[in-house]
Amino acid sequence: MEKALPSIAAPDLEITLVEKQSELLPTQGFADELRDQVREQLKELNIRLIEGSELAYLPPFNVGELGRFVVETKDGHRIEADMWFQCYGARPNTGYVAGTELQSAVRPDGALKVEPTLQVVGQTNIYAIGDVTDVRESKRADAARAQARIVISNISSQLSGKEPQATYNPSDEWVILPLGPEHGASQLLDSQGNSRILGPDQTAEIKGADLMVSVIRSQLNLP
């Protein structure tokens, strides 16, 4: 979605987003109200959104390479453009475990299979957290931090001669999605775990100014 941001800095650019799924932000758990907010703001920014379709063929230029071309989606939408970006097909970067004892824990999609304790399946003293795991949730920094706390607890138990007891339970989905410094929408969880939707003003206040770089710097004790 952030690929749409150049239209804010350079309003003369024509941006088209093609979403293969039937609706944008298809992750289970995201509210329709969130999607509606994002759709409306993309419209305000004159960004063309095509949902429920995909390119019938790839452009004749490499990703990020400048060159005029015309493509069509499988359901007939015509797109003229000068550059394209592939924002799909992410795969966990686990190639480095090939040929090691962890190879048997790698799923066909590249993710590492982990136990609820976050131990790699088949291993006692090897843990995995973050994007490489097969934990069924969106891959977020806060989720990786929460997983790290579970691993710390379990390693501490093992160092004390005890069995790992702490288990990781994915939280409900949430997202803070800025569309430039003044637009965006968010789905957050209140103290009771209920979802609430924030509009552009609140989203910009939380993340729009610096993409929360200052918050992360503070957490890491960086200047």
Language-model-detected regions and their locations in the chain:
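Rossmann-like dinucleotide-binding cores of NAD(P)H-dependent redox enzymes
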Residues: 1-53
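Alpha-helix termini
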Residues: 2-10, 61-64, 158-164
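Hydrophobic/aromatic beta-strand patches that form the interior of the parallel beta-sheet core
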Residues: 16-18, 50, 85, 127-129, ...
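Cofactor-binding loop segments of dinucleotide-utilizing enzymes, especially the Rossmann-like FAD-
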Residues: 20, 131, 181
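A conserved short coil-to-beta-strand element within the FAD-binding core of flavoproteins
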Residues: 51-66
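Glycine-centered tight beta-turn/hairpin loop motif at sheet-sheet or coil-to-beta transitions
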Residues: 74-76
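FAD-site-proximal beta/loop scaffold in flavoenzymes
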Residues: 78-146
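C-terminal, flexible cofactor-proximal segment of oxidoreductases
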Residues: 138, 147-223
